[in-house]
């Protein structure tokens, strides 16, 4: 299957994001700089782009409430400063380029090294490809006692040629400079092992995976009041998608599959809850235009609070090519919506096949349409799957338990290091920092 590419950043959703975060996060004033006089352990959490703050909601606040002093680092942007304020943590802006840019990357590395040298944190957690690499190197050079690389996915899976090789080297170097590589799904860990990103002993998975779990009080079954506002008749079947509208998320295949669905179910509608992200896997102009003009496709743009939109859907589809662990699948499941997603890395972990949803191979529009039609034709099966999906989330992915595991694990890493067990070097990376 063909893959598409391009690069940049979307910012049109900022006001809505800030409004929703203020509703669902505890507000607190940002710290200009964590106090060195405090005995609390200091953790620096780094990401490349402030947009990634969307996946950190609750994580930073939980660490802070557990007794950590937290500093969030990313490229400059209002999302960085606002997220830090909402989570009650410090923030530092260091420009980092998403694309390969040797000179700019070196400058970013020096700035990260200076920051860590000044703050002297007990722990670092860097994620996303560029911040993960530069942060891991800077942390090693500064001798940070506990260095965590949080692997949220492998971009190299959908790349080829020289670029794939460069990304592989970057992942391997980030892992080599870290004590622990946390993976947010079992299949991602297995893929990292298969690709030789790191040794099996260094790659860790906490519990059943997921970065933050899901807020089951926010994402839950309930009445839907959005259909009229979205222009959807009350009784028509609605197929939904939530996320960035990009090629890596399988949008070209989904649009083709929807036309096949309409041939059988002409009353169906497709609800796309997301935005056109001008990233490396951006959609082409022709496909964008087709989506915007299609009479049965409803495009919301960026939505900060997606919870009520799941209640509009009869089936949620994520035809992705790669994931770490897709939050949107958990959110749909918690809302009692069956999901059709792929056997790709990460996404296969987010569904119990034939119980909470259906798994299909990536890249096949026919597989998408057939799976969706199976569910649309059988309301009772959809109901059973939805109930099973919510029960599965309640058993495995409630956010407070998922984040509690992270806090407990991080405290165990600090206990090992602060009590004098191998604070740096290969011995610490490979044997001292074992998971609980």
Describe every region a protein language model picked out.
Residues 92-93, 172-224:
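Donor nucleotide-sugar binding/catalytic pocket of nucleotide-sugar-dependent glycosyltransferases
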Residues 329, 338-341, 351:
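Short hydrophobic beta-strand element within catalytic cores of glycosyltransferases
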Residues 53-61, 237, 241-260, 366:
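A conserved mid-protein helix/loop that constitutes part of the nucleotide-sugar donor-binding site
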Residues 353-354, 358-365, 374-380:
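Conserved acidic donor-binding segment of nucleotide-sugar-dependent glycosyltransferases
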Residues 28, 111, 216-232, 285-288:
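A short helix/loop element that forms part of the nucleotide-sugar donor recognition site in Leloir-type
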Residues 302, 321:
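Aromatic "clamp/platform" in nucleotide-sugar-dependent glycosyltransferases that forms part
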Residues 284-301:
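Nucleotide-activated donor-binding/catalytic signature segment of Leloir-type glycosyltransferases, i.e.
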Residues 139, 374, 381-396, 402-408:
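A short, well-ordered alpha-helix in the C-terminal region of glycosyltransferases
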